[in-house]
């Protein structure tokens, strides 16, 4: 999907030592493409690919119902960590690390901080208080 492709295209991963090795999708329009050197395979090839390639971290950017199923498949294949962008907190084997990323929560936090900054700015404009103390020489 779009988020998966955006992450695969992100240049800073490579600069920090992370390499996207392969992508998996169910969309026939995307399967067979190469994105930043990583081929897009059909999701059905997941287990076969992981059997032949040493992959430690998987990134999930799919709908909730598919994410749970794919996470179980990844665990059975020996994945050590999952970076999860699906709209669900994954419950996986104890020895598999999961980082659940909730984009909507992140956006809500950003929005809250922006509103708080606007209120502070408005208060400053109304009171003339810049927050800088006056010197009394």
Walk through the language-model features, giving the residues of each.
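Aromatic-residue detector
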Residues: 13-14, 18, 51, 126, ...
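NAD(P)-binding Rossmann-fold cofactor-contacting core
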Residues: 10, 14-36
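Hydrophobic/small residue at the entry helix of a nucleotide-binding pocket
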Residues: 3
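Phosphate-bearing ligand-interacting subdomains
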Residues: 38-123
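Ala/Thr-enriched low-complexity intrinsically disordered regions
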Residues: 124-130
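Intrinsic disorder/low-complexity segments
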Residues: 132-135
């Amino acid at each position: 999907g779009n988020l998966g492709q955006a992450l695969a295209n992100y240049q800073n991963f490579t600069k920090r030592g992370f390499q996207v090795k392969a992508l998996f999708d169910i969309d026939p329009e995307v399967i067979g493409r190469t994105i930043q050197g990583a081929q897009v395979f059909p999701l059905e090839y997941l287990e076969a690919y992981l059997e032949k390639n040493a992959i430690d971290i998987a990134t999930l950017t799919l709908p909730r119902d598919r994410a749970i199923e794919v996470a179980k498949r990844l665990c059975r294949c020996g994945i050590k960590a999952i970076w999860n962008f699906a709209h669900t907190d994954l419950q996986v084997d104890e020895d598999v690390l999961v980082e659940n990323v909730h984009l909507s929560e992140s956006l809500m936090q950003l929005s809250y901080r922006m509103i708080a900054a606007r209120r502070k700015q408005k208060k400053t404009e109304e009171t003339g208080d810049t927050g800088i103390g006056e010197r009394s020489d």
